[in-house]
Amino acid sequence: IRDRDNKYTNIFEGKNVIVIHGESLQTNLMSLSFNGEEVTPNLNKLAEEGMFFSNFYSPVSVGTSSDAELMFNTSLLPTKSGTAFVSYSDRTYNATPKLLGEKGYYTFSMHGNNADFWNRRNMHKSLGYDRFYSKTDYNVTEENTVGLGINDYAFFDQSVDKLKKIAKKHDKWYGMMMMLSNHTPFSEVDKYGDFPVDIKETVTNEDGTTEEVTYPYMEGTKLGNYFKSAHYADGAIGELIERLDEEGLLENTIVVIYGDHDARLPRADYNRLYNYDKETDSILDKDDPNYKEYDSYQYELGRKVPLIIWSKDMKGTDLNKEYTNVMSMYDVEPTLGNMLGYSNEYALGHDIFDIKDQNIVVFPNGNWLTNDIYYNSQKEEYLSLTDKPVTEEEIKKNNEYASSLLDVSNDIIIFDLLKKDQTDENKVIEAQEKGA
């Protein structure tokens, strides 16, 4: 079932699409800077010039990056056990590459890792990609390797070379470029370039002379290393956009960037970020009036990832703004589909411009989030995010919706319902409409 037409319907119809799958990029990176230097200056610039969805979540399960791909492309949720990519790659999916292929697009995916990682070799065929470029299609050397494979700079550079050939052959194309460098454990600090995550201050001595004093702050911590890694990856995004522009590949093209999931770093690691005492190089005592509590709810709500839709001519238009309604990775296909002129009648997510502030983000563990409430299904308790009163009826209704959505999505994948003459269509539609 597709959402209603709205002012965004078909606005990007016929445009080429570049999707950037941003490994472990979180939204909170975008508000951080050290010594006046932003962690993600390029992401920030694209967000400022494009459509920035700032309340966006990627409710992945054990399939992490592959779960993000599943949700982004199919508007289904992760399976309850195992992963769709590994266990259910032979199923039928109404995926964006397949649906755009039916509209005459050439579709491809690019990733510098092994083709068998998360079984992408098989799953990308099921999603409808015409071509999957993987590690063997790239010139990978010891020098250009970071972490799991080719670094993002070399990957993007070689990918643009391939894209130039694709663009010459095909009038319309849709491609996903999957980043790799900003992958846990964020330990190759010597390769990330110079980005200190300390505090530098100029102090005036009694004799009037000045000197620069450095406090370690996040240096030597796993979270600090994550910031360095993310800054490195952000630089690669900046170079990619520049190169695409130089090659004329941004004409009639939209760029979609999303963070695939949060960095999965423990909550305790954030304590130093928010409660650092530079005088003692330690964490403030909980009794200190300046101590900031970072509880489990703040941690969960802080796991949001960026979603940016950008084109070189979008700045200053009506589209160029921040969109703040809660949104999930499985809402992207119906939202993007409405803009590009295709639809998946079995999408479990919604076009965010249709559902607006009535949206619900459902997580694989049964937790859910609206603009007003974050509900923890394990503890059976909620955090109210606004002054709006919360009723038991609303909690019950949303719990039923979350449970139904997870069940229906799981059944669609496991029992291959999109192939089996779609006899479960009514169940799908019922789940879609319950929380709408």
Regions found by a protein language model. Give the residues of each.
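Solvent-exposed soluble domains appended to multi-pass membrane proteins
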Residues: R2-A436
